[in-house]
Amino acid sequence: MKRKAARKPGRCGARAAAARAKSPAEAPAVLVKGDKRADLAGPGVSTYEEVEKILPADYAPILDRKETQIAIRIAKDAVEDGLCRELNLIRVECPLIVTKASGVNDYLDRDGSRTPIDFSCGLGLERRIEAQVVQAATKWKRMALAQFGMEPGEGLYTDMRAVRKDYFLDHDHSSYVDQWDWERAMVASDRNLGFLRDVVARLWKVVKGAEREAQKRFPRLRNPRYPDLPEELEFFHAEEILEMYPDLPRKQRETRILQEHPAIFIIGIGWTLKDGYPHEMRAADYDDWVTPTTSKSGGPMHGLNGDILVWNPVTKRRHELSSMGIRVNKHTLRQQLEITGQLDFLKFPYHQAILNDELPLSVGGGIGQSRVYQALLKKAALGECSVTVWPERLHEICAARNIHLLR
């Protein structure tokens, strides 16, 4: 697809991008390879023929199934201890279900293509409770900061479980989600890229610490065929990556840059870039992707959020570990909802609480548990680390390549 003429990103551009990123029911039946619309909002490979092509043919797991479970426990403890130490967090309980009326569920992106599971509960009630299974605890966590009386510099993490029914199920995308969802209170003066980078660096230190702990118990995880994660990750703005690879869609840009820089944090996900598309769709009511910032070279940028991605030497593919960011304040919440045409969200209690300064300013994110285990334990598929439902075809494709998904 030819690159469109660069233009200054803005509200009109963001609205246009949102309109182009239609829900699956509205989208064209066929998207040409290289079309930047194809992966705006959607994780997953999208066809099992493609999955067959990309999975390694020479895979041999380093740890067997029993050893893998032991290593998962070691890595899990190391990450949770590290989060508490590096970010001053405490563990709190997290809901699996929330009320629909609260507006606290996570819709993941802004095109409406990933809807939560709705159901009624409360046998014997005159009016049953309209509830939803959480897709992530993103918005709930910010409310929890107030509930638990967190001061700036204090925060919480949760052992979050969720269901995302609208994902394509492949080797690294599942309908069952296990995350360390975390949130930390902050002050207004921390709403800048320097603070964001410091938090990301602390998170990376936690991940590397977990890698070392797993390797203490299982030294053979230090395998030259599958290099360890780098000691430090590098920061790039989505706009900078677009300038480096202007003709590639988002996932291919990520794949290219990760081959040279195997651990990166991509800043500014959600704002419309110079080619007229956001790097990826991002919901308008938690991460701040609208705030103006400046690149290392002095160029105008936007966004106080991003993703941690690494190169997976087993699958030879991009591998996302975390999505996070400084959260919207009352001004940027309204700006972003106006851009996405969702000002009606302001009626919900969560959004009203932000507008009325009833919730702390915060930074937070989600770290995929099975995704971290997959990276640290040099696995080819999420299903080697977590138990969920997979189509039989995926079981067969994986088994033919010595990848055995748990049942």
Where are these regions (language model features)?
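Structured aminoacyl-transfer and RNA-binding surfaces used for tRNA recognition/handling
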Residues: 31-407
